[in-house]
Amino acid sequence: MASIEAALAEIKRGVEELIPEEELIAKLKENRPLRIKLGADPTAPDIHLGHTVILNKLRTFQDLGHDVTFLIGDFTGMVGDPTGKNTTRPPLTREDVLRNAETYKQQVFKILDPAKTKIQFNSEWLSKLGAEGMIRLASNQTVARMLERDDFKKRYNNGQPIAIHEFMYPLLQGYDSVAMETDVELGGTDQKFNLLMGRELQKANGQKPQVVLMMPLLVGLDGEKKMSKSAHNYIGVSEAPSEMFGKIMSISDDLMWSYYELLSFRPLEEVAQFKAEVANGANPRDIKILLAKEIIARFHSQADADAAEQEFINRFQKGAMPEEMPEFEFESGIAISNLLKEAGLVASTSDALRMIKQGAVKLDGEKLEDAKLIPACGTSVYQVGKRKFARVTIK
């Protein structure tokens, strides 16, 4: 294993909050492989780069010689995590959860080492609790404690319903840590309440409490909201290399440094050198190309990364249109602003109107100036800015 100081520096890279750091240092000094857990409810089949921030950190622990478990919440996925929700999340069927879980496993192994990764399902212990076990688990907390959660508090104050089973979710996630005797649990900053519940339940069960490590939420392509499919600002890990390359090149120069910190495995000293070069006049585009190629090589191959770079150069330095682009179908009567939003070319309808006004939207290579246009039936190519293309069919 690496020295404690070197290991701690690697572990803390990009971390938003570590609770508590001194306990992590004490665990590292035990000079044994720590039990590291990352849990995920397979509520959707596809993973985007925002999800990989925490997976990258799990890989760091793996590379440092620790025992890593990727826990699939097949039981909790059927309950539904209420985190950040102002309404009760619709429960998934077991068939949905298991189907999504298979896709999850295929995608996470693009980051994690399959030979060093333990996959577990929390139904292994949660389905055995039974009514008595559930009541005993619920007795560890109070309604007042649950209402300390921001999302529960807001719903309660606004008179919005909170289902009893939603109160159980943090307890079930916390019990995962008891069942696994976890040393360190990873999660996003939005999971803080649930992660700390694991510490509390471990103490109640006579275990040493886990260390909680939280990673920040990755900002999406728009530079404002967290990366998500609903915001149309994401990069899927299974997207075509050319599509990934173009999207990464579209981020702002400032956001690029955050992506380097959270998505790259390059040494921090090398990233600092890149920053110095840009400060001294180097073109940030060249540094961004290195980032794009690193990410694409990880999820596809180095050959794909090289080809995507060449296509990017051909497309934007020689004015060529990409051979591959996302394709969409819409019913006739859709407004141009809605079309651009639904095709993922802009973040919102107001953004669409602004881009049209600025002359940044093209229809089949011609500048589009009518912000009230109702596109005619047929297939056309829409372009926003230099890098975003979509082939749209109006039926």
Curated annotation (Swiss-Prot):
Matching NCBIfam families: tyrS
Catalytic reactions on record: tRNA(Tyr) + L-tyrosine + ATP = L-tyrosyl-tRNA(Tyr) + AMP + diphosphate + H(+)
Residues of the S4 RNA-binding domain: 334-394
Biological process terms in GO annotation: tRNA aminoacylation; tyrosyl-tRNA aminoacylation
EC id: 6.1.1.1
Repeat as UniProt keyword: no
Gene: tyrS2
UniProt motif 'HIGH' region: location: 42-51
Motif placement: 'KMSKS' region: 226-230
Subcellular location: Cytoplasm
GO cellular component: cytosol
Self-association and partners: Homodimer.
Protein name as catalogued: Tyrosine--tRNA ligase 2
A Pfam family per the record: S4
Coiled-coil intervals: none
Residues annotated as binding ATP: K229
Entry keyword Membrane: no
Single GO term (MF): tyrosine-tRNA ligase activity
Function: Catalyzes the attachment of tyrosine to tRNA(Tyr) in a two-step reaction: tyrosine is first activated by ATP to form Tyr-AMP and then transferred to the acceptor end of tRNA(Tyr).
Chief place where the protein resides: cytoplasm
